[in-house]
Amino acid sequence: MVPVVALVGRPNVGKSTLFNRLTRTRDALVADFPGLTRDRKYGRAEIEGREFICIDTGGIDGTEDGVETRMAEQSLLAIEEADVVLFMVDARAGLMPADEAIAKHLRSREKPTFLVANKIDGLDPDQAVVDFYSLGLGEIYPIAASHGRGVLSLLEHVLLPWMEDLAPQEEVDEDAEYWAQFEAEENGEEEEEDDFDPQSLPIKLAIVGRPNVGKSTLTNRILGEERVVVYDMPGTTRDSIYIPMERDGREYVLIDTAGVRKRGKITDAVEKFSVIKTLQAIEDANVVMLVIDAREGISDQDLSLLGFILNSGRSLVIVVNKWDGLSQEVKEQVKETLDFRLGFIDFARVHFISALHGSGVGNLFESVREAYDSSTRRVGTSMLTRIMTMAVEDHQPPLVRGRRVKLKYAHAGGYNPPIVVIHGNQVKDLPDSYKRYLMNYFRKSLDVMGSPIRIQFKEGENPYANKRNTLTPTQMRKRKRLMKHIKKNK
């Protein structure tokens, strides 16, 4: 399971700045789900190869009425579901009553909490953080998030040791065998026979979507039984349920994000929908089913969730639920809207189903298997280079500064999603339009469906770069004769 780090604190203490610093602003997701404060941010970050989800919980105001009554419900939920909390305070503003109220709440939750004093630029860190020791949260880590000062130390001394304890790196990635074989080819070693077969592994399938789009109904329909979806057990509010199942002789692990709730606490949509749980399920899955409500159409929330799926590189099947009972005219309108708003997702299969009545559900697994097979298929260097050559013959790369970009060869750089690495000269200068052409050409030639495909470009290093030219003996003699001739004619 991908760990979760929550950034907590008063407004304007620098949570968003640290969030952007940790995620490097890539893969950031702005979510506007029901019950969530507008512009709540979720992003993917990593420390030395270990990925985690970072959450900017937004500002929390603690008052004399008690922090629990004033906190945004989603901020409280984020704290509950986080594995570790970075509690941020403003070193310039000093200790505030709201800080004390938040610290009191965090102490009661018994979460791993680290106190981070931000905005220490221009201050004596030791003197600036003295008052915050009264919060009773142990050691204080001074940083200046806007300039990056102290952030590396925070990562190395706080988050990294904690993540090593939570998720040891000994865990072997499913694709490790692929990388070992790839490195062997690169080093000119003979390809060893191995027993690794992606078909022997169960397909991890996550069903995600907004509240009330029919995820639970679809889960129950797939399993062929009514599952109890409300539990009253300690710890069941955080982790998704992993359900092994078999269909048509193929093993699956269904990641259920909709079925775990705490009894008596479901008051509105915010409790029924955990963004964190959904993002963790996406990261852990091989294939993601995105469920959309046909009666409500494509919302901004759907597009935000879709963006996270694409950035994660997961295979995708789009499921339009509640298709039954719609008139033919409405169905045509829904299809037009889908084509317009999802036109950029040309690789994913779209299914129109009724989870309640079961119509169309049986066809979903054919697309799931197709997407998984596409994302894990092995393709050799010779095949990829041949496809690249055919693409160049069909459409030459453009001229860059008067010279034609030369593509030399291609090889596999990874799987799930498939990555094609192309080597050549001036490849970094290729326009985006030609890069898209190559991506689509590889997709069509390899018959990749249901999975994104990524193209990476690498330039060969110029051995003479940054080196001074040296003349050959012949050139030296010619230069001497030329210099004598010039001096004689002066």
From Swiss-Prot:
<feature type="domain" description="KH-like">
    <location>
        <begin position="377"/>
        <end position="461"/>
    </location>
</feature>
<feature type="binding site">
    <location>
        <begin position="118"/>
        <end position="121"/>
    </location>
    <ligand>
        <name>GTP 1</name>
    </ligand>
</feature>
<dbReference type="InterPro" id="IPR006073">
    <property type="entry name" value="GTP-bd"/>
</dbReference>
<keyword id="KW-0690">Ribosome biogenesis</keyword>
<dbReference type="Pfam" id="PF01926">
    <property type="entry name" value="MMR_HSR1"/>
</dbReference>
<dbReference type="GO" id="GO:0005525">
    <property type="term" value="F:GTP binding"/>
</dbReference>
<feature type="binding site">
    <location>
        <begin position="56"/>
        <end position="60"/>
    </location>
    <ligand>
        <name>GTP 1</name>
    </ligand>
</feature>
<dbReference type="InterPro" id="IPR027417">
    <property type="entry name" value="P-loop_NTPase"/>
</dbReference>
<keyword id="KW-0342">GTP-binding</keyword>
<comment type="function">
    <text>GTPase that plays an essential role in the late steps of ribosome biogenesis.</text>
</comment>
<feature type="binding site">
    <location>
        <begin position="321"/>
        <end position="324"/>
    </location>
    <ligand>
        <name>GTP 2</name>
    </ligand>
</feature>
<dbReference type="InterPro" id="IPR016484">
    <property type="entry name" value="GTPase_Der"/>
</dbReference>
<dbReference type="GO" id="GO:0043022">
    <property type="term" value="F:ribosome binding"/>
</dbReference>
<dbReference type="GO" id="GO:0042254">
    <property type="term" value="P:ribosome biogenesis"/>
</dbReference>
<dbReference type="InterPro" id="IPR005225">
    <property type="entry name" value="Small_GTP-bd"/>
</dbReference>
<keyword id="KW-0677">Repeat</keyword>
<dbReference type="InterPro" id="IPR015946">
    <property type="entry name" value="KH_dom-like_a/b"/>
</dbReference>
<feature type="binding site">
    <location>
        <begin position="9"/>
        <end position="16"/>
    </location>
    <ligand>
        <name>GTP 1</name>
    </ligand>
</feature>
<comment type="similarity">
    <text>Belongs to the TRAFAC class TrmE-Era-EngA-EngB-Septin-like GTPase superfamily. EngA (Der) GTPase family.</text>
</comment>
<dbReference type="Pfam" id="PF14714">
    <property type="entry name" value="KH_dom-like"/>
</dbReference>
<feature type="binding site">
    <location>
        <begin position="256"/>
        <end position="260"/>
    </location>
    <ligand>
        <name>GTP 2</name>
    </ligand>
</feature>
<feature type="binding site">
    <location>
        <begin position="209"/>
        <end position="216"/>
    </location>
    <ligand>
        <name>GTP 2</name>
    </ligand>
</feature>
<feature type="domain" description="EngA-type G 2">
    <location>
        <begin position="203"/>
        <end position="376"/>
    </location>
</feature>
<protein>
    <recommendedName>
        <fullName>GTPase Der</fullName>
    </recommendedName>
</protein>
<dbReference type="InterPro" id="IPR032859">
    <property type="entry name" value="KH_dom-like"/>
</dbReference>
<dbReference type="InterPro" id="IPR031166">
    <property type="entry name" value="G_ENGA"/>
</dbReference>
<comment type="subunit">
    <text>Associates with the 50S ribosomal subunit.</text>
</comment>
<keyword id="KW-0547">Nucleotide-binding</keyword>
<feature type="domain" description="EngA-type G 1">
    <location>
        <begin position="3"/>
        <end position="166"/>
    </location>
</feature>
